Swiss-Prot record:
GO terms for cellular component: cytosol. Belongs to the TRAFAC class TrmE-Era-EngA-EngB-Septin-like GTPase superfamily. EngB GTPase family. This is Probable GTP-binding protein EngB. The keyword Metal-binding applies. Residues 24-196 form the EngB-type G domain.
Length: 196
């Protein structure tokens, strides 16, 4: 699968179902804790530097951001979870917004859950993965920041994350570095069956 980086646009930032775009395109949602690198991942996958706004400040994405990717699919950037400085009320609001999207959106075909390869999955990572499995949502786990781990230890870290998430044998886990940028095609190939 190839995408034209010049044919990508943010369609809408939504907080409720009525605002979701009316489209026939399949959707791939990206979830992960705050600062795991969701926006950086989106930018590196589509070959654009600043399409999805990155921030040093965790918890910056507060809406569901729908990106039309070359009229082939829609990436949905979901607010990051597990950010302590967001108020309890705000966390509950995010929770409801994400739940409504995940449980009601028929266009949703796949969730890419991003976890930090350097660390054990957080309790929130585990809860999110279990939540997706509870609703039978196909999930691709991408371990970000691969470049921060010595090459010889990458597989050990992947195995650890797979074990701690208690991953479904049908789900795939891949390590990724937005800096090395060498696995986009592999990931597009994993996404493609869900959107055709």
């Amino acid at each position: 699968m190839k995408v034209n980086p010049n044919n990508i646009e943010l369609i809408i930032s939504a907080v409720k179902e009525e605002q979701y775009p009316e489209t026939e395109l399949s959707e791939v949602a990206l979830s992960g804790r705050s600062n795991v690198g969701k926006s950086t991942f989106i930018n590196s996958m589509i070959g654009r530097k600043n399409m999805a706004r990155t921030s040093q400040q965790p918890g910056k994405t507060q809406t569901l951001n729908f990106y039309n990717i070359d009229e082939q699919l829609i990436f949905v950037d979901v607010p990051g979870y597990g950010y302590a400085k967001v108020s309890k009320t705000q966390r509950e609001k995010f929770g409801k917004m994400i739940e409504e999207y995940i449980t009601k959106r028929e266009n949703l075909q796949l969730v890419i859950q991003l976890v930090d390869l350097r660390h054990d999955p957080t309790q929130d990572d585990i809860l999110m993965y279990n939540y997706l499995k509870h609703f039978d949502i196909p999930t691709l786990v991408i371990c970000t920041k691969e470049d921060k781990i010595p090459k010889g230890k990458v597989q050990k870290h992947i195995k650890n994350i797979k074990t701690q998430l208690d991953m479904d044998p049908d789900d795939t886990i891949v390590s990724y570095s937005s800096i090395q940028n060498n696995k986009q095609q592999q990931i597009w190939n994993l996404i493609e069956p869900y959107i055709s």
